[in-house]
Amino acid sequence: MSRYWSPVVGTLSPYVPGEQPKLPDLIKLNTNENPYGPSPKALQAIAAAAGDTLRLYPDPASDDLRGAIAAAVGVQADQVFVGNGSDEVLAHVFMALFRHGRPVRFPDISYSFYPVYCGLYEIPYQVVPLTDDFRIDPADYQPGGQAAGGIIFPNPNAPTGRALARDEVERIVTANPDTVVVVDEAYVDFGAESVAPLVDRHDNLLVVQTLSKSRSLAGLRVGFALGSRALIDGLERVKNSFNSYPIDRLASAGAQAAMQDQAYFDRTRQAVMATRERMSADLRALGFDVLPSAANFVFARHPEHDAAQLAARLRERSILVRHFRQARIDQFLRITVGTDAQCEALIGALKKIFSS
């Protein structure tokens, strides 16, 4: 601790990202990256943008990118906010929309960046327990007395992978008209229903998505939010008080091309979903309890094997999976859906571990 720190810094518990080791022949199933790579058209667009214009600042409004996103998801361009990854978008959300002096509500088992943002911005929060079978119950988000300072949850939830139907999300939004409800749809393209079509109907709904997962652009850091013009204007005001140029020229070019290449997007996400179902069946055949997943990962536990030890033994075999040392889920592993060959290697390694 430094005597030069601001007082809040010493109270922070920063987010811990998944490890990114530089090891040869590693099967990396721990950070939910897409195994199929970006659209070739996105790579071509990035290469084409890597020219003399890099000496110039990018468009601070990211108009072309916002237009491409709007066209892809069916909203107007002025209903789109873009940021340097959905984590930055979420950071702006907490600053712009959640600092009301009232607790923000989110699930007890959810994206671990939410309490980090609350600590950073000194926002009170209240965790809402998932059900015994790890579902978000819309009834638990009915207002009781004073309106919440905000509501946020992933759909599908992370790390569980379970998803709410669109009408269930709308129940939460409708029940909280005086509260901004943020739906974090990082994994929505792998089998869940997006609530983006509802933003015209509900001015308190904000939808956040990313190009890191289904568009295979985690290395570019591009995320976006969809919502009413008033919510988007609030995010823009915070962004322009922090960094007016969050999206660089290369990221913008690649993201636009990725959003426009619908055929590649559909083909690769369908491949991920098909592999997920095969891997889930294979894990169940080995005795794992596997939660239903609408994401590009599965959440599984084995009744006879400790999760932390399994993760360690898989690592010895150059296979990385994610283990969380958190109450209620410390016996689960979150396993990213890789290629068929990677998932077959995982199953083979588990069979050897169980037989040894």
UniProtKB/Swiss-Prot annotation:
Endpoints of the signal sequence: none
UniProt-listed Enzyme Commission number(s): 2.6.1.9
Keywords: Amino-acid biosynthesis, Aminotransferase, Histidine biosynthesis, Pyridoxal phosphate, Transferase
Disulphide-bridged cysteine pairs: none
Reactions catalysed according to its record: L-histidinol phosphate + 2-oxoglutarate = 3-(imidazol-4-yl)-2-oxopropyl phosphate + L-glutamate
Alphabetized GO MF terms: histidinol-phosphate transaminase activity; pyridoxal phosphate binding
InterPro entries referenced in this protein's UniProt entry, alphabetically: Aminotrans_II_pyridoxalP_BS, Aminotransferase_I/II_large, HisP_aminotrans, HistidinolP_aminotransfase, PyrdxlP-dep_Trfase, PyrdxlP-dep_Trfase_major, PyrdxlP-dep_Trfase_small
Pfam families reported for this sequence: Aminotran_1_2
N6-(pyridoxal phosphate)lysine carried by residues: 213
Top-level class of the enzyme under EC nomenclature: transferase
PROSITE patterns membership: AA_TRANSFER_CLASS_2
Keyword Amino-acid biosynthesis in record: yes
Cofactor annotation: pyridoxal 5'-phosphate
Pathway assignment: Amino-acid biosynthesis; L-histidine biosynthesis; L-histidine from 5-phospho-alpha-D-ribose 1-diphosphate: step 7/9
GO BP annotations listed: L-histidine biosynthetic process
Family matches, as HAMAP family: HisC_aminotrans_2
Stored NCBIfam families: hisC
Family membership noted in the UniProt record: Belongs to the class-II pyridoxal-phosphate-dependent aminotransferase family. Histidinol-phosphate aminotransferase subfamily.
Subunit structure: Homodimer.
Name of the molecule in the record: Histidinol-phosphate aminotransferase 1
The species this protein was found in: Bordetella parapertussis (strain 12822 / ATCC BAA-587 / NCTC 13253)
